[in-house]
Regions:
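Conserved Helicase C-terminal RecA-like lobe
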Residues: 68-86, 91, 105-225, 296, ...
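SF2 helicase motor core recognition
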Residues: 8-9, 172-174, 214-235, 241-258
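Cytochrome P450 catalytic domain signature, combining two hallmark sequence patches
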Residues: 96-103
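Short glycine-/polar-rich loops that comprise or flank the Walker A/P-loop
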Residues: 10-14, 30, 73-75, 182-185, ...
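Conserved P-loop NTPase motor "coupling/switch" region that bridges the ATPase
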Residues: 1-64, 257
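A conserved SF2-helicase RecA2
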Residues: 225, 239-312
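Conserved nucleotide-binding/hydrolysis micro-motifs of P-loop NTPases
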Residues: 3-9, 21-24, 38, 84-87, ...
Length: 312
């Protein structure tokens, strides 16, 4: 499989059950014996037992093992302080939803409530990107956007070509407007981009040095593209699943790349974005011990993890 397990032991079970039905028992038994103890209780003994069961059947082809000639990849996390008006909006919304989210998490209708909780978390993430994603008539600025544009302009002056990823197509539209204002030539790829057009855009970007920036929505263009014409990657906002961002970075850091790839992850300081990074690190320790795949999905967060996201 070319699909990361993404820290979901249910996915691991389903793959084994397809290949060798019954080897990892029924899913109900597997969940009781392994998934709950490992994911929720971080039980080392259960983790080692599962690893022993699957190890003889797992051959991992990692980039580090087979692509020793690849150039370096330098990853830097760049923090930014929210603008005063932006911060006021963030703290006001956080204050309004805290109590409601705590109630929703404690109720039994988990599916419906979970959607409400994730929607609230999405609003916080959007405010970090640009309040205009949340408040349509917002006329103020976004410190992250200013930081992003500063990096982009300096990189272009130094001869770099950039892949710029965001989870939000509406954020890409805001960045697109700024690129036009600065007379920076760019391409954009989202879920609305047709397959034939994707191929043409990729070829043109890799071969035309006048096109300096490729705006890409994380879900639409995070996999399956060869964009070695770029040697810089900017992740405008963090996604729950670190593996998805790593795959997106690998659009540039892959066979055919001859330059060091510089990766910038933009993070709004003292916000939910910092908490998402912490979650990724915590989950990585667990998943490294199983299959060395980093990842967390928002739907898999525990009550404690969700509440921690809302801490100031």
């Amino acid at each position: 499989t070319g699909t990361p397990i993404e820290n979901s032991l249910a996915e691991l079970w389903s793959i084994f059950d397809f290949i060798m039905p019954g080897y990892l028992y029924t899913y109900k038994k597997f969940k009781t014996m392994y998934e709950i103890p490992i994911v929720k209780e971080e039980d080392e003994s259960s983790m080692q037992k599962l690893k022993m069961l699957i190890e003889p059947f797992v051959l991992r082809r990692t980039k580090q093992e087979v692509l020793t000639e690849l150039p370096e990849k330098e990853i830097t996390i760049l923090e930014n302080e929210m603008q005063e008006e932006q911060e006021e909006i963030y703290l006001s919304y956080l204050s309004n939803i805290k109590e409601e989210v705590a109630k929703l998490i404690g109720q039994t209708d988990s599916g419906k409530n979970q959607m409400k909780v994730l929607a609230a978390l999405t609003r916080l993430r959007q405010i970090c990107c640009h309040p205009n994603l949340f408040i349509k008539d917002y006329k103020g600025e976004s410190s992250k956007l200013e930081q992003c544009m500063e990096i982009t302009k300096e990189a272009i002056k130094s001869g770099h070509k950039i892949l710029l990823f965001s989870s939000y197509t509406s954020m890409l539209e805001i960045i697109e407007k700024r690129l036009k204002d600065e007379n920076i030539k760019y391409f954009k790829l989202t879920g609305a981009t047709k397959v034939e057009e994707r191929v043409d855009l990729v070829d043109e970007f890799n071969n035309n040095n006048e096109i300096k920036v490729f705006l890409i929505s994380l879900k639409a263009g995070g996999t399956g593209l060869n964009l070695t014409g770029a040697d810089m990657v900017i992740h405008y906002d963090p996604w729950w699943n670190a593996a998805a961002q790593n795959q997106a970075t690998d659009r540039a850091h892959r066979i055919g790349q001859t330059h060091t790839v510089t990766v910038y992850k933009l993070i709004a300081r003292h916000t939910i974005e910092e908490k998402i990074l912490e979650l990724q690190e915590n989950k990585k320790a667990l998943s490294d011990q199983i299959l060395s795949e980093e990842g967390v999905t928002a739907s898999q967060l525990t009550k404690e993890e969700l509440l921690k996201l809302l801490q100031n």
